[in-house]
Amino acid sequence: MPHRRALDARAHRTAVAEALAVAGLSSLALRTIGSLSGGERQRAKIARAVCQTPKLLVLDEPTNHLDPRARGDLLSLVARLGITVIAVLHDLTLIEDFASHVALIDDGRLAAYGHPQEVLSGARVRETFEVDMHRLPHPFEDRLLCALDIPISRPINRPVSRTGPRPVPSR
């Protein structure tokens, strides 16, 4: 970890003001944390992170508390600053807009990696998980196929019981 530089009070206030301005949050400078909405808190945390001008930023569900406009602002901010971001996202509709590359993780293992359109296509998901429409799928496969709106020929909103090992993703 690089050493953080110590700032005097004036430099600290200036850095905070600049970070809030970059994130479009200048109006929040004098408010307490308790008075901020969830989305404002989320954006303030991101502003705090980017004011250190990192080369890499790891974001865990960065858009959870953001409305659609604020999500767009966040994507624009990250793109404008040119920071490399590793983002943990479960909102599959956001992934295509946010990511240049996608790693699909299943049970802690890398299941697929590539460009969003390629990884999130129905054919790639079926190939990756060797989805057989005549067997009961693993619950992860069901959730993924539903989230990606991939048409399937069987009902999936029923309890799934499974015997045997989980399918091994192809490489």
Task: Briefly describe each language-model feature range.
Residues 32-36, 40:
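Conserved ABC ATPase signature
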Residues 57-61:
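Catalytic Walker B motif of ABC-type/P-loop ATPase nucleotide-binding domains
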Residues 95-97:
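A short, surface-exposed alpha-helical micro-motif characterized by mixed small hydrophobic
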